[in-house]
């Protein structure tokens, strides 16, 4: 540690010098806000985290000497920063558009997307699960062919990111071991989830091909019933197709268990979820769902479903999508925002937020609290649904990821609990799914 302190002491002095100049000019003391504003703590490479840590220690020492501050917020923020830097942060649901994966426009740049590498670096997000999503179409050869082409284009886009656009900064991970390997060489990780098994058609050999392309979770359905499963959208009109999952759906689950792909429960109907859990030989996940007790929406999970997932050894990745976090609060804010005449008027927008607050990060973490209290700390995780409708005040994009850790620290979560919530629980399930696959393949 002393060696690192010596190596980076000049950097520290430069930061403090700049802060002193700013402080002197503004006639304000150096505070946590001035430090946070330097982007000091989230440098752009994972291998720089030791530098971050050393500078943080020196800055903390400087503040204590300068102010003898009694402000508890400073200590809380510093504690959260240390935890955030040491924790593997993983978001299980980030949608993509292939238009953002070209030579001239891609995630190596700070695009207007909610997730890209610069935003991940600024927010300290280590792992993004990029989603191969296809909307539900007709259940015929033409529909399957079109969906398969859509899915293939998204697989290829993700591979271009890690192979061509930013191979020195991000790699494709398939397991905990490959994640660890990427971390050791200072890279962030992309992982792949498939949202809607519809593009498989009726060709179950595609499950193996998707696995080989990097898919490590897949949902049987999305918005609309398909050849494998009923969707939770049937709750709106009372419709079903299979009264759960079809025989073909059971065979897809068997294939996913065999190869080591986690079964995702976030879009199928309640009866489909019950039957899927009963049929699967491996634990399951809900990649982006929250607690229905707090926000009554079919995409969320009721207490009975939460218990089913716990009993199966699975994990619920709480989602930061405003409608699913607090339906009533979101609808009130949305109505007020739509009534605003000039939506570019910053002052009017701030006044609106004070009068009619939007769904925020505190509301989101309420769901983590609820699920933790209902089924235990080992069965809850985090997802954003960024670039697919997700985002709440305080976590509007990947650059604000630290705020989630800060809110957890404010609520008294320990560093061990935060590590489980951010990635430990999800990776435990992935490990167990891989173990089941190895056993099935050995028999």
Q: Where are the regions a protein language model picked out?
A:
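N-terminal hydrophobic targeting/anchoring segments and the immediately downstream early-domain regions
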Residues: 66-240, 292, 296-443
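Proteins with a high burden of low-complexity, intrinsically disordered sequence enriched in S/T/G/P/A and R
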Residues: 10-12, 22, 33, 246, ...
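Bacterial Sec-dependent N-terminal signal peptides
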Residues: 6-75
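Generic signature of intrinsically disordered, low-complexity, basic-rich segments
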Residues: 27-28, 34, 40, 76, ...
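Loop-centered beta-sheet repeat module
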Residues: 242-289
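Short alpha-helical patches at coil-to-helix transitions and adjacent helical residues
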Residues: 52, 270, 398-401
């Amino acid at each position: 540690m002393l060696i690192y302190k010596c190596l980076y002491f000049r950097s520290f002095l430069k930061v403090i010098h700049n802060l002193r100049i700013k402080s002197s000019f503004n006639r304000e003391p150096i505070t946590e806000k001035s430090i946070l504003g330097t982007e000091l703590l989230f440098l752009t490479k994972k291998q720089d985290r030791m530098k971050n840590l050393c500078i943080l220690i020196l800055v903390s020492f400087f503040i204590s000497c300068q102010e003898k501050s009694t402000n508890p917020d400073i200590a809380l923020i510093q504690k959260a920063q240390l935890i955030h830097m040491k924790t593997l942060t993983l978001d299980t649901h980030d949608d993509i558009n292939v238009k953002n994966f070209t030579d001239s426009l891609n995630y190596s740049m700070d695009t207007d997307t909610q997730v890209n590498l610069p935003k991940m670096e600024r927010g300290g997000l280590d792992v993004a699960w990029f989603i191969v999503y296809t909307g539900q179409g007709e259940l015929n050869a033409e529909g399957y062919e079109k969906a398969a082409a859509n899915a293939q284009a998204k697989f290829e886009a993700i591979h271009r990111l890690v192979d061509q656009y930013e191979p020195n900064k991000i790699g494709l991970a398939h397991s905990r071991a490959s994640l660890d390997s990427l971390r050791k060489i200072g890279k962030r990780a992309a992982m792949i989830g498939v949202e809607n098994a519809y593009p498989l058609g009726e060709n179950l050999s595609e499950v193996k091909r998707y696995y080989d392309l990097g898919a490590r979770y897949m949902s049987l359905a999305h918005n609309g019933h398909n050849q494998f499963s009923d969707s939770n959208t049937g709750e709106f009109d009372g419709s079903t197709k299979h009264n759960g999952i079809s025989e073909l759906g059971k065979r897809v689950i068997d294939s996913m268990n065999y190869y080591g792909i986690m079964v995702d429960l976030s879009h199928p109907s309640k009866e489909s979820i019950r039957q899927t859990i009963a049929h699967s030989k491996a634990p399951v996940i809900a990649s982006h769902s929250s607690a229905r007790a707090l926000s009554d929406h079919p995409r969320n999970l009721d207490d009975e479903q939460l218990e089913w997932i716990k009993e199966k050894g699975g994990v619920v990745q709480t989602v930061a999508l405003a409608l699913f976090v607090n339906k009533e609060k979101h609808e009130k804010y949305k109505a007020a925002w739509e009534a605003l005449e000039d939506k570019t008027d910053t002052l009017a927008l701030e006044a609106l937020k004070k009068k009619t607050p939007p769904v925020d990060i505190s509301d989101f973490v309420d769901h983590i609290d609820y699920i933790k209290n209902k089924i235990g700390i080992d069965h809850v995780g985090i997802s954003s649904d960024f670039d697919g409708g997700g985002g709440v005040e305080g976590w509007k994009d990947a650059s604000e990821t630290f705020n989630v850790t800060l809110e957890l620290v404010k609520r008294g979560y320990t560093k061990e609990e935060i590590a489980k919530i951010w990635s430990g629980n999800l990776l435990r399930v992935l490990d167990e799914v891989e173990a089941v696959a190895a056993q099935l393949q050995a028999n």
